[in-house]
């Protein structure tokens, strides 16, 4: 278990640290020419978590801190994060080509798509995240003289609060199709909160809207103590280098609905792509297999969903 319901964070604490870790992985993938996120490394530097900064700029290498052969470590992350970055970049390109002119990035973290993608004229991008995260990124990118390539509207609200009203106040037109993404989010939501979010997205969407999501597996039958011990062992050297990240404390394990099936019941059509397939399709290295892949990024599945006319209310 879990993040307390009243917990808040910035990019250097709690759940926010995972966004900075993902940005560090994007910085490495950018340097390797796999993706192009020129803002990733500067943002990681600005956050100031020494371990992640050193990793992002190449002063710390995965072999220094990973447990050999572990499927959960820094070595696996740049390819996995690059694959999902490409996936959601292409999702937005396809949505824009289909005429959608509203994009919502849920739990946007250090995402810079509003600044780096070539959006069509008339595109509005909404970013939703914790107030401290929104303030940090907005300020850091302004200091870099970065300019958004769309009409960017930040919505500083916790997704556990009334974000739907805040989004509408920011100008979302729910009578028009919207392209939503939930990237690196569901594992940090309680199962019932995941359902509420999908219900809310559906309520705010008109037919033709699209949702790109990264889903984590049901782990109801997994021994939580054993899972914690595996994670602690895999990240032991991180702590030796001064970086403490208890993923099991900030994430939610246990029983949860299958995202694809849940969305289909709400009137969406879905196409699923498991992580292993996504990596293979993009010519990226596979993640080492574990005895139980549900605790690694091999357990992640990506969904592209489109809302039909027969949605459930």
UniProtKB/Swiss-Prot annotation:
Metal-binding as UniProt keyword: no
Highest rank taxon of the organism: Bacteria
GO biological process, one term: methylation
UniProt: S-adenosyl-L-methionine binding residues: 129, 158-159
GO function terms (MF aspect): methyltransferase activity
A Pfam short name: LCM
Keywords: Methyltransferase, S-adenosyl-L-methionine, Transferase
Enzyme Commission identifier(s): 2.1.1.-
InterPro entries with a match to the protein in the record: Ppm1/Ppm2/Tcmp, SAM-dependent_MTases_sf, SAM_mthyl_Trfase_ML2640-like
Function: Exhibits S-adenosyl-L-methionine-dependent methyltransferase activity.
Homology family: Belongs to the UPF0677 family.
Protein name (record): Putative S-adenosyl-L-methionine-dependent methyltransferase MAV_4573
UniProt source species: Mycobacterium avium (strain 104)
């Amino acid at each position: 278990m879990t993040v307390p319901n009243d917990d808040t964070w910035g990019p250097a604490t709690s759940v926010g640290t995972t966004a900075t870790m993902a940005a560090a992985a994007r910085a490495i993938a950018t340097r390797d020419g796999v993706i192009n996120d020129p803002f990733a490394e500067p943002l990681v530097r600005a956050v100031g978590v020494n371990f992640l900064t050193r990793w992002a700029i190449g002063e710390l290498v995965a072999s220094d801190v990973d447990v050999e052969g572990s499927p959960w470590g820094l070595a696996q992350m740049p390819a996995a994060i690059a694959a999902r970055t490409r996936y959601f970049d292409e999702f937005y390109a396809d949505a824009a080509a289909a005429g959608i002119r509203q994009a919502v990035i849920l739990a946007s973290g250090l995402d810079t798509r509003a600044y780096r993608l070539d959006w069509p004229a008339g595109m509005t991008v909404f970013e939703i995240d914790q107030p401290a995260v929104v303030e940090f990124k907005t300020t850091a990118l302004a200091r870099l003289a970065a300019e958004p390539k769309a009409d960017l509207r930040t919505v500083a609200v916790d997704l556990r609060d009334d974000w739907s009203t805040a989004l509408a106040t920011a100008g979302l037109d729910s009578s028009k199709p919207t392209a939503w993404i939930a990237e690196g989010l569901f594992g940090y939501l309680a199962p019932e909160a995941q359902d509420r979010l999908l219900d809310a997205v559906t309520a705010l969407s008109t037919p033709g809207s699209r949702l790109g999501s990264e889903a984590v597996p049901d782990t109801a039958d997994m021994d939580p103590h054993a899972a914690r011990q595996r994670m602690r062992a895999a990240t032991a050297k991180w702590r030796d280098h001064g970086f403490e990240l208890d993923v099991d404390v900030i994430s939610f394990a246990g029983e949860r609905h299958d995202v694809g099936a849940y969305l289909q019941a709400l009137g969406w059509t879905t196409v699923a792509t498991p992580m292993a397939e996504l990596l293979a399709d993009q010519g990226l290295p596979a993640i080492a297999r574990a005895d139980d892949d549900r605790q690694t990024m091999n357990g992640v599945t990506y969904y592209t969903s489109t809302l039909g006319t027969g949605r459930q209310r």
